Amino acid sequence: MQTSTKTYCIIGDPIHHSLSPAMQNAAFAAKGLNCTYIAFRVPEAELKESIESLRSINIAGFNVTSPNKAPVMKYLDELEDSAKKAAAVNTVNNIEGIFRGYNTDVYGFIEPLRKRQVDFRGMHVLLLGAGGAARAVVAALAEQKGVAKVVIANRDMQRAEELANLGDGSGMKCEVMPLAGAKDVSPMCDLIVNATTLGMKNESSVIDYQNIQKGSVVYDMVYRPLVTDLIENAKLAQASVVYGYEMLIEQGAKAFEIWTGLSAPRDAMKKNLLGIFGEPT
């Protein structure tokens, strides 16, 4: 590696599944940049020491994934508005030694819905999960006009309540329920979002196709495998689907732009990912 090479990375645990290195390295190559992007496994218990190590090597920037999106905030120097609203960080830029945190998941989540011209007015949303990814969903939905209600279904009810309070503070009506009961409310929902890791290991979804409304939108943030059980069920129910890779590209593109100041080569990023996945049918 040349001394002038800028190094970026992603930190989380587990990390072996991450496609961010392949996608971002494809983006750097497409723009002819002397940059490289690697993955580091960082459990939450080792987060403080890992951030200190990244400072010591003068890392150019990095992404943060589960379980570190909320805990990392206290080790950063500055937070951009998106990170404050989501109370979570997924992107950090090193600005002359200042670690500034952003949440590009907020933009990354909403952009595929905007492209589909989804109407949020009067919308009832079912959100599965209450972790860092779910925080970005709530922050993104709070910026849309007219969302009627968000039901947060999660195993840990305390975390669900904390997220509901975040949503309520943004002017949205939020309710909580156990994850196991999600199928009871899903038939009444216009948008179903999976912000858990359920499906990453080919697990069955907590919502089967009989409990998905025809014409609703089902959004699975899991991107590997490309087609999860929830996505399969959504297709059977004749719902519209949003794939996790779409959010991955958009949040990654925004991170790329923060780091480089250049427009992201989205086509190259998408081509790289779909070369790994294969085109969805």
Predicted feature descriptions by range:
Residues 2-4, 120-121, 144-146, 207-216:
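Short, conserved loop/helix-junction motifs that constitute active-site signature segments
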Residues 170-241:
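Rossmann-like adenosine-cofactor binding region
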Residues 38, 151, 242:
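Conserved beta-strand positions in the Rossmann-like core of class I SAM-dependent methyltransferases
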Residues 7, 36, 124, 148-149, ...:
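Residues at the starts of beta-strands that form the adenosine-phosphate
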Residues 12, 101-103, 121-143, 154-159:
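Glycine-rich adenosine-cofactor-binding loop
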Residues 2-116, 225-227:
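Phosphate/diphosphate ligand-binding glycine-rich loop within oxidoreductases
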Residues 144-170:
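NAD(P)-binding Rossmann-fold cofactor-contacting core
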Residues 221-281:
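Adenosine-phosphate binding glycine-rich loop
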